[in-house]
Amino acid sequence: MNVLQPHLRTHLVHMPIMAACGNAVHLHSQLDATTRAQGSNPRGPGLSRLIAAGLLFAVSSLAGCDAPTSDTSATGQASLQEQQSATAITQPAGPSPRVAALLEALTLEQKVGQMIQGEIKSVKPEDVRDYGLGSVLNGGGSFPYGKKQATVAEWLAVADAYYAASIDTSAGNAGIPIIWGTDAVHGHNNVIGATLFPHNIGLGAANDPELVGKIAAATAREVKATGIDWIFAPTVAVAQDPRWGRTYESFSSDPERVRQFAAPIVTGMQQSGVVATAKHFIGDGGTFRGIDQGDTRLDLETLLEEHGQGYIEAIAAGTLSVMATFNSWNGDKIHGSRELLTDVLKERMGFEGFVVSDWNGIGQVSGCTNDNCAQAINAGIDMVMVPEDWKAMYLNILAQVRAGEIPMARIDDAVTRILMVKEKIGLLDRRAPSIEAAPLISVIGAPEHRAIAREAVRRSLVLLKNQQGLVPLDPRGTLLVTGPGADDIGQQSGGWTVSWQGTGNTNDDFPGGQSILDGIAAQVSAAGGSVITSVEEGTPDAVIYVFGETPYAEGVGDIETLAWQQRSKQDLANINALLETGKPVVAVFLSGRPMWVNAEINAANAFVAAWLPGSEGAGVADVLLRNANGEVQYPFEGRLAMPWPRFDLNASNPDLPVADVLFPIGYGADAGEDIDVTGLPEGAIGVLETSDEILFEGSVREPWMIYLGDELDPALAAGPSNAKSAAGHLSLSVVDKEVQEDARRLAWGESGQTTTVYFGRGQAWDASGLAGAGGALTFAIRTVEAGSKNLQLSTQCGANCGATVALNQIFETAALGEWVQYALPLSCLETAGLDMTAVTSPFGLASTGALTLELAQVAIVERPGEGVVTLECGAE
């Protein structure tokens, strides 16, 4: 499947830059000979593009070399020239006269303004006018006016306001139209009613670049319809360890399979008038232990060979932007790496567009903060994504240029790149976004887009087990469809779905979408059969049990082991209970990665890896069910794009990905094929070393939920983002502590009424084991404003049962604005009246007066970590 043979591709990507001119000429001759041997166009146009892109690793070393000696063949020299001209991306064309003239006319302030990107929650239209900002973005779960249910008209109204401000020159602004970026990673996933396609891991299993190109174009049209011109996609990460929380954003663990998707996505988006972004440069899928934003430990040649293929192809296709990655490379944050961002990406790979930083990514560079990082600009960041602290960043860049810390030439290069992109997509001459979008208003969730999504769903599912050819099922009988994921469009869509984490949604948030249950029920009804959802409703002919991961995004999804439900095994118990009906059970597993589900595979009669299919549940029904005549409707085309693990951990070294493969890349059974998989090992290698209960770590962890309580509503579910108590006394909002949205800001008003934020769950929890082991409740707090200094920690164990502890002492232990990790021994709560065997809320904060805090990292642990401040039981 390689467009380049492995030995040739290695030469192209990894040719040492210090190679002598003679070695470079030898490479040219070798390329020419190989091309002649394979024919003029052995694998289509992709070959010449890759050759041209790859040559940059060697061609850059030719500058200043003498002309080839006379014994160099004319044929070889001609071949080099042809290969260099095969794609324009290999030779920077430079700015157009228009861009050059525009740059010349800009003041320093206007240039720096073009380099700044703030988040819409922190940027008003007048800010765009006053500072001449070049860009805004909406992060995951960020909406116009803060309205989750914002209409297309409201999206366009905000886009129009930013546009009008950007061309308003009354405050000294240069009048350059702004560009708005968004994370539309599986459809326009922030917009209610948009088509939601399968996440990349499913598209990798479908393995059809042409289909993926159609999805990219459809997504771009829906994005354009809301007045947005820039998509932060495609993700061309090559996920090597499924423990990584962003595995589902990767098409495959195979660099070649990832490579083949890059060009169709870039082309599909940019031909639809929207800027594409290849991300995250580079190595985000190869971090140690799969830790998000962690360290990728590879030499340069291996880094490019394993993680650079998608960028080579995206650049060859003309991607206009590249996003830098959070992760480090051998200990150093890539946001500060000139070697990778400039020497490799821009100079050797020939990237002509602009590089944008990731969300506050510059702040992770050693010696930098979120609002101050000359090193990142000098390394090659052209546009800085600074969601909240953009104004301070703007002022700091100005000061650093004036002080000589950032060369003016670096500013000019960055702004030139940004202006070239704006010119390329016609932004410099655009009309108001609402006018541009008028012909596209009807495309949001359009039937033709949903048809593409449905096709992608049915072609992505992988049949892992199929005893006696059970699947597809006959729809003319009675089917029991059940399980926690059966009727949940949010769960089947995964992270980056309306909210950043994909949590806090109901089926009502997906107008036009269809759950797996609804998709099955519609087809069964049409065939004359019936669907029931519990054994109490009748006796089924077969059972479909849908289960899987709760949605997550980024580091929140990082896991220590691939074991599914290592603690509870509730799904296994449910499958076994359903088998007691005497009817066959088809298990449909919703996940963002291959996982160790040996026990569940052993138990079920058939097992389907459904990945995260998105809004079109009918696509799942298409392959699970036969038609009304008992015939196969569609084949099972999905084949694994990542290996499926035999064990939960690497037995020899848990730091490494699981090496023992149960099902290899390319595996998948056909519809009706008899594939029996039994006797798989069910003993876990990884053993839980602690019984710690995590309530909040980046997000609220299931089964816990966060509630706001006051005199009007004692149990208002807060969801994953901003919320207010019913009477308005307490507001909750998401903020950043260490990574994006990993903390919550709690602001009490001066109401005189006790208002509480607390964690609860549907069933009582037995914490007596942790209490008996000397455990503690731990939490991190930062005091922002302390008007009343009236704060209590509250816990509950049912009606008229609980304990309250005064927390006024925290105002004495930390300075205003300082994060402190606290621990309260569980024995304190037990003494105060908390029944440890029936805890319904182990943590809450209550106040009656004006107080603003930030909260993070809430857990009940056996042993608090180092640096924790232990609170005294009886202290006020």
List where the protein language model places each region.
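Bacterial N-terminal signal peptides that target proteins for export
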Residues: 7-15, 20-51
